[in-house]
Design a protein with these regions (language model features):
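Short, surface-exposed ligand-recognition loops at beta-strand->loop->(often short) alpha-helix junctions
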Residues: 9-15
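Short, flexible segments with low predicted structural confidence
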Residues: 1-2, 16-17, 33-35
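Short phosphate-engaging motifs
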Residues: 14, 48, 70
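Glycine-rich beta-strand-turn "strand-cap" elements at beta-sheet edges
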Residues: 2, 40-48, 76-98
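Short, well-ordered beta-strand segments in beta-rich or mixed alpha/beta enzyme
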Residues: 2-9, 39-66
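An amphipathic, aromatic/His-enriched active-site/gating alpha helix that lines ligand/cofactor pockets
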Residues: 20, 24-36, 55-89
């Protein structure tokens, strides 16, 4: 199992735009064959901070995700919304086992 935690800081005035764009990416991502989970979390103390919790069956599936039309559209759409660069941190999932 391949897990990536993506830390996102959005310009405060673009939060709603980011949520809309990210919903479309989420909806496409959860349909990918290797996707196991794709959660989008918002910090209640700072609504401009988000965490994307992405779980794929393998590293190859996670890499393939970045070539999908929905991901590429999302990446381009949110580029100008970022208050700082996104930080993706890979993790190895232990439990639950696949």
């Amino acid at each position: 199992m391949h897990v990536t935690l993506v830390h996102v800081k959005v310009k405060p005035e673009r939060v709603e735009d980011f949520i809309a764009a990210t919903r479309a990416n989420h909806e496409g991502s959860v349909r990918e064959p290797g996707n196991r989970r794709f959660d989008v979390l918002q910090d209640p103390a700072d609504p401009s901070r988000f965490l994307l919790y992405e779980v794929y069956a393998s590293e190859a599936d996670a890499t393939a995700h970045k070539q999908t039309a929905h991901y590429l559209a999302w990446r381009d759409a949110v580029a100008e919304m970022m208050a700082e660069p996104r930080q993706g941190v890979p993790w190895r999932g232990l439990f639950p086992e696949d």
